[in-house]
């Protein structure tokens, strides 16, 4: 028998060893709808100003969003006057939800439609609209998840006392929540008080790029008033107090009979330090405190994080003993809106000054990719990084306990509104897989809703923005014609037919068919 040279044996050995390493490094996961825990609900969402339209119909009065868009300050110079026309087409939309197989639908209520003066008399037409839509969802067997507020304060309250920067908002918000709980709570499974306050603080009250368009020089331009050094902190403080007040009301007056749950929502970016320098690592941790700790630390521990207290100093409101007790544990769940991750670095241009704004307090630069031009504001990235969602969930678990979490928004837009949205399907598969992996690693995630059910008037881009909907809307038509995208068929196959998603080596490939609805 012929002997092989030693170098050949070594070559074969190292080849086999390398192949084994490569195989071990291949991530392989195949899963179906049935692999998620009992009680887990898949859904999609919309928001009132962006979806309903009918801005001046049936007693609705202007919100701060109406004022902002009609002032011409919106970058696309459009308004939500018609939006997706959900006010008139909700029955058609619920039928589409049923055809897709949505298990849950998260929408927001327009405070200005339900209580046009901000407080006091309830608008019968507004009440009828929400009751009718909720009843359609009940008939369809779709779980109802309602958010009370998404940056659309009645303009009357903004004019009267400055809205969220005034403590009077706590009582008015609680009274508004009381109406919602009383009128709709027998059919609502989940209540979310406020959406994304942690990033609205910057956009609404520091840079002023969102309503009520508040900022102060030199921190922002072309604003209607404001003080960038203190108003972001007043906004968050009163959000937390209003949220906690509504939670206490719900628990004391409604929860036992209605058997729903209540929580608050946060925007969630994940952060990677641009370099391994101490400065960039410090900036990353600071960004996490302002993104997560600003909301979660008071809700879990009764006070703001030490990092924020140290940076902001006397500009940061404080909780009285009573308020600290009120906010602590004032939630049944936390909602996360998570889309992407960013790279973070220390903002060396920030000079410590007696008065500085929220952006300077964060003192961090953000990049969607390492080579992007940095920005000092919390702005959504466009990277596809499902590991970032897993990291965010693990960070929350390590720092605040294994809280009940609902992924309330996650999605990807298409710039041209294409119906053949394969990239969106790939994105959604990756993040749904990441959600399942996080659950298997111990995260207490109870639901996932993609953004959005239907094309809407987008916050930053209006009608000319990227389109996020499972269902396309022809905004050029007066009828606002609907047409399901390929992603709607894929989601339907996953939800209704238990079609598998296969994950191989970082590539997420659906085995589901794409039959048209």
UniProtKB/Swiss-Prot annotation:
A Pfam family recorded for this sequence: Glyco_hydro_1
Organism: Oryza sativa subsp. japonica
A GO term for molecular function: beta-galactosidase activity
UniProt keywords, alphabetically: Disulfide bond, Glycoprotein, Glycosidase, Hydrolase, Signal
GO biological process, one term: carbohydrate metabolic process
Protein name: Beta-glucosidase 20
Cystines in this chain: 215-223
Carbohydrate-modified residues: 222, 227, 402, 410
Catalysis performed (reactions): Hydrolysis of terminal, non-reducing beta-D-glucosyl residues with release of beta-D-glucose
